[in-house]
Amino acid sequence: MTKSVYEFWISQGKDKLRLPVLPDQLSISNTVQNETVKVAKFGDLTFIDEQGAKEISFSSFFPKKYSPIAEYQNFPSPENAITKIEKWMKAKKPVQFLITGTKVNLTCSIEGFSYSEGQQDIGDRSFDIQLKEYKTASPRKIKQKKKTKAKRPSKAAPKTYTVKKGDTLWDIAGRFYGNSTQWRKIWNANKTAMIKRSKRNIRQPGHWIFPGQKLKIPQ
């Protein structure tokens, strides 16, 4: 009998089991966990989620003796094969399910395993097995942005104005502020220098300014 190009392997670490007899049928289901939400005026809205885990199921048997239906010789006894699978289940660790010649190579959990007296020969063990793709949740790393201290706006340096012949603080204020009544801002910013220049500014604040004199114009 011509042997199949496919080999079914189940392993956990270095402990491996190759199925002696290939199943007649292999079922692999793949679902998407979509969520449907009812929204007023819009009806049903479906949000497509990530692809769900694959589920694999098949049936076969562990032969007691070699026959042409077996894929290879010197396979483990039905008792040893069953013990191996049950040991993997008790370990609560995933197994690797591989089918050579295909793209099937999945890390799985054993969801169900049952066996019974075989229907071929005495000593054979028929079995059903259900596997589910095992996915680990990897936490996403979120980079936390460092808070930067807001820079306080620096005070703008006051402008300077060189007094011309005929200027008054009243006129200068009207020119820079559009409001001549703001002349006291210029006076307060230059009071010390103006009094130093002419003591008459004590009695008549801001009245005495001179051509060539530099005045600070505050913002």
UniProtKB/Swiss-Prot annotation:
PROSITE patterns: LYSM
Record field: compositional bias (Basic residues): 138-154
InterPro entries: Bact_Kbp, Dit-like_N, LysM_dom, LysM_dom_sf
Residue ranges of every copy of the LysM domain listed in the record: 159-217
Highest taxon in the source lineage: Bacteria
SMART domains: LysM (SM00257)
Pfam assignment, any one: Dit_like
Record region (Disordered): 138-158
Protein name: Phage-like element PBSX protein XkdP
Protein's organism: Bacillus subtilis (strain 168)
